[in-house]
């Protein structure tokens, strides 16, 4: 009887470990796929518009506006800044204020070949809609001359939240995301943590 009980206990522990490992691998793959999709949108905007058209060209503004329209389910807004943080172009729902002190701006300036994921920002309080502030260093054309700057894309968090929310309901584990300064980007129990 004791041997049988030990066998069952060992079996259940092993199955739990295997299931947790499988869930972790699926979660990692789903998040990786979503990040690849986001990065692809960001790189497409950069290489096919920002780097291709002079910002003084009316096609530049039209193409960026169309990019937002065609991705309206995922993109809240776009903006382009010079390396001093001065706004060069922004979509209608963003402000033209200087951004040189924002963490997403300095991260993009300091990490030239990296797409930087900044903190969440609430954009629709009534619907509790949030965006990730995603940025990257870019080269743009202004009056025929190549310049350096930062591209900001505000991307709705819904797709990543949906992936992570699935794991909130598991019996034995949950997942959370942190930014590079150890602030929560996502935690399934953030409301409970915030309220103490």
Predicted regions and their residues:
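Solvent-exposed, extracytoplasmic
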Residues: 57-71, 150-192
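Sec/Tat-exported extracytoplasmic proteins
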Residues: 31, 46-49, 68-72, 168
């Amino acid at each position: 009887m004791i041997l049988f009980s030990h066998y069952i206990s060992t079996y259940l522990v092993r199955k739990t470990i295997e299931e947790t490992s499988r869930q972790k691998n699926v979660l990692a793959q789903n998040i990786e796929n979503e990040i690849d999709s986001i990065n692809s949108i960001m790189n497409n905007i950069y290489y096919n518009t920002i780097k291709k058209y002079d910002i003084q060209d009316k096609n530049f503004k039209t193409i960026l506006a169309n990019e937002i329209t065609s991705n309206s389910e995922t993109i809240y807004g776009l903006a382009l800044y010079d390396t001093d943080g001065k706004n060069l172009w922004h979509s209608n729902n963003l402000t033209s204020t200087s951004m040189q002190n924002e963490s997403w701006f300095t991260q993009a300036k300091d990490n030239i070949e990296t797409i930087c994921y900044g903190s969440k920002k609430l954009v629709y309080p009534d619907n509790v809609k949030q965006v990730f502030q995603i940025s990257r260093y870019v080269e743009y054309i202004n009056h025929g001359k190549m310049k350096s700057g930062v591209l900001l894309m505000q991307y709705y968090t819904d797709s990543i939240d949906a992936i992570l929310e699935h794991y909130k309901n598991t019996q034995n584990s949950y997942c959370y995301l942190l930014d590079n300064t150890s602030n929560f980007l996502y935690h399934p129990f953030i409301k409970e943590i915030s309220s103490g």
